[in-house]
Amino acid sequence: MKHLHRFFSSDASGGIILIIAAILAMIMANSGATSGWYHDFLETPVQLRVGSLEINKNMLLWINDALMAVFFLLVGLEVKRELMQGSLASLRQAAFPVIAAIGGMIVPALLYLAFNYADPITREGWAIPAATDIAFALGVLALLGSRVPLALKIFLMALAIIDDLGAIIIIALFYTNDLSMASLGVAAVAIAVLAVLNLCGVRRTGVYILVGVVLWTAVLKSGVHATLAGVIVGFFIPLKEKHGRSPAKRLEHVLHPWVAYLILPLFAFANAGVSLQGVTLDGLTSILPLGIIAGLLIGKPLGISLFCWLALRLKLAHLPEGTTYQQIMAVGILCGIGFTMSIFIASLAFGSVDPELINWAKLGILVGSISSAVIGYSWLRVRLRPSV
C-alpha cells in the first residue's frame, strides 16, 4: 500500500499508466486471441436520447469526443491560468507558442507534399503530419516528472492547443462537406451565454458546465471536432479569487486525477490499437508513409525550432521563463506525436478513396509518432536536470 501511494504521488505516474495502456492496446489489437474482443469493445454502440435529441455513437467516439472534451477543459483551465497569472502573461511570451504552432503546421505539410505532390490521390493527405496529439505528447512529458519546468509544460500545452485549433480549421475548410450551420449557430449562442456569465461575475461552476454540455452537443452536431468545446468552457470559468476561492483553480484540482488516471489511459487504450497485419518493408518505404514519417519526425521539430528561432531573433517573442532553446527543440520533437488527430485526418482524406491507403497512413503515423516520442523523451531527459 505504501509503494502504491508513492507511485500515485509521483508526477510521472500518469504518463506511465498512459504508456502501459497504449502498449496493452497494441498487443490486444495484434493478438488473435484478443483482437476480436478489443474491436468489439470499441464498436459497442452507446445511445443517448433527450426528447428529440439523439446521439448515437460507438464506444470509441464517446471516448474521443466526450471524455476528451473533459481533458481539453482541464487544458483550457491550465492555459488560462498561465495566460492571466503565469508564464504566458506578457504579449511576447504568449506570442511564442502561437508562432511555434504556425511553423509546426506549415513545414510538415510542405515536407509531406515534397514526397507526394506528383500523386493526386496521396497529395490529399497533406494535413496529416500537421497535427499534434496533445494527450500523448503531455503523457510522454509527464514521464520526466518534476524535473520538467512548469513553463515548458505550459508552452507544450499552448502550442498543442493552437495546433489542434489549426487542425480543426483545416478539417472544416478542406475535409468537411456537410457543416451544419444551424448547430454552429447554437454553439455561437452558447459561447455568448458563457461570456455573459463571466462578465456578470457568476461563480457557480455547475452553471458553466451545463452551458458547456449544450455547447459540446452543438459542436458535435455541427461536424466540427467536439473537444474544442472543452477548451472554450475552460477559458470562460472565472479564475479570480474571491474570499480565497477560485472556481477555475478548484475545478482544475478536481479534474486532475480523473484525467490522469482514467480519461487519458482510456483514450490511449482506445486509440493505440493499430493493426500491423500485412505490413511489409516495401509498403513502409512507399511515398505515403515516408511523407508522413518525414513530416512528423523532421518537419515538426524543424518548423517549430525555425519559427521560434526567427521569433527570438526578430524580438517578436521571449523564451518561457526557466527554459532553454534546446528544451524548446526537444518539445518540438514531442509535437511530432501526431497519432489520433493525424489518423482522423487520414480517414477523412482517404476514407472514400481506398481503405488500404488509410492502413499505410496509420503505419506512417505510428512509426513517426513513436520515433518522435522516444527521441523527444531521450533529448529532454538529457537536457532537464532532476529536481533536488
UniProtKB/Swiss-Prot annotation:
Q: Where in the cell is it found?
A: Cell inner membrane
GO MF terms held by the record:
sodium:proton antiporter activity
Swiss-Prot/TrEMBL catalytic activity: Na(+)(in) + 2 H(+)(out) = Na(+)(out) + 2 H(+)(in)
Q: Which residues lie on this side of the membrane: Periplasmic?
A: 32-58, 117-122, 177-180, 223, 273-286, 351-357
Q: What is its main location?
A: membrane
Q: State the membrane topology.
A: Multi-pass membrane protein
Gene Ontology process terms (BP): regulation of pH
Q: Which UniProt keywords apply?
A: Antiport, Cell inner membrane, Cell membrane, Ion transport, Membrane, Sodium, Sodium transport, Transmembrane, Transmembrane helix, Transport
Provide GO CC annotations from the record: plasma membrane
Segments traversing the membrane: 12-31, 59-80, 97-116, 123-130, 155-176, 181-200, 205-222, 224-236, 254-272, 287-310, 340-350, 358-380
Q: Sorted alphabetically, which InterPro entries does this protein's record hold?
A: Na/H_antiporter_dom_sf, NhaA
Q: Give the family, as the similarity comment puts it.
A: Belongs to the NhaA Na(+)/H(+) (TC 2.A.33) antiporter family.
Function, in words: Na(+)/H(+) antiporter that extrudes sodium in exchange for external protons.
Identify this protein by name. Na(+)/H(+) antiporter NhaA
Q: Organism, per UniProt?
A: Escherichia coli O139:H28 (strain E24377A / ETEC)
Which gene name belongs to this protein? Answer: nhaA
